[in-house]
Amino acid sequence: GYARFIEWFKNREDVENARRVANRDFDLQDVELRAVRDAVAALMPGFDTLRIDREVAPPAMVVTKGDVELRLDQLSDGERNLIALAGDLARRMAIANPGSDAPLETEGVILIDEIEQHLHPALHFTVIPSLQRAFPKAQLIVTTHSPQVLSSVPASAIVVLDGFDASPVTSPTRGRDTNAILREVFGVPARLPEQAQEVLDIVRLIDGDRLDEARTRLSNLAELLSEHDVDVLRLRTKIDFAAVGL
């Protein structure tokens, strides 16, 4: 958890500050802390200057997000968890490779269960590429139920687990629409059954040249789903084409 990470970081920063004073070198960086700072920067673009603020009681970890310095308890659970994850992995790699100038390039296997937990959906798209960037020589083995996470990796990197059965993914995933991934990988419909059936019914009305009824049903559906919904737009186009005999 991030509480233990903060305590470790504070202790290391105390050592780093003492060495800076003793060596009269205020650019000196503790190897383990440098690895943590580099990992956080790689995993969380826009975050910088991770440090302990000792002018408050008790001392608190702060980080610069954009142009604003924030305490860790002002961040979302997901942001705090990512900082703790990056810090813990980087710390372990630095400890395992004393004297290394590039501890984040340590080879190893990283296991993460339900990587999307507590993360804002926008971070689902970036968390895997960011981990790969932060720890380029580590093998990641993660579990997820997020179609956004799957859309950030190729199908060849995905295995579907169903009980004790494991099967490959045969349809493309990287860059795919998340509704397609829900349907093709998770086997979950993108819509509630009622709305999915209404879309099919409107298609049948159009194919049967019952355009006025199709327009009425589509207007009702658009009020529910919005005029910008992909199926609403598709059905409007289909009606327009049918009206001119195309």
Regions found by a protein language model. Give the residues of each.
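Acidic, Mg2+-coordinating catalytic modules of nucleic-acid enzymes
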Residues: A166, T170-L246
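Soluble or luminal CAZymes and related metallo-dependent hydrolases
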Residues: L28-A35, N81, L123, E194, ...
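Proline-centered flexible-loop/turn and helix-kink motifs
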Residues: P45-D48, P136, P154, S226
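Coupling/switch segment of ABC-type P-loop NTPase heads
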Residues: G1-L43, L182, Q197
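Accessory N-terminal region flanking or inserted into the helicase ATPase core
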Residues: V31-V36, M44-G46, V62-D73
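Switch/communication elements of ASCE P-loop NTPase nucleotide-binding domains
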Residues: P58-A190
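A generic structural signal for well-ordered alpha-helical segments enriched in polar/charged residues
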Residues: D38-A42, R91, R133, E223
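Long, charged, glycine-rich C-terminal linkers/tails
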Residues: F47-V62
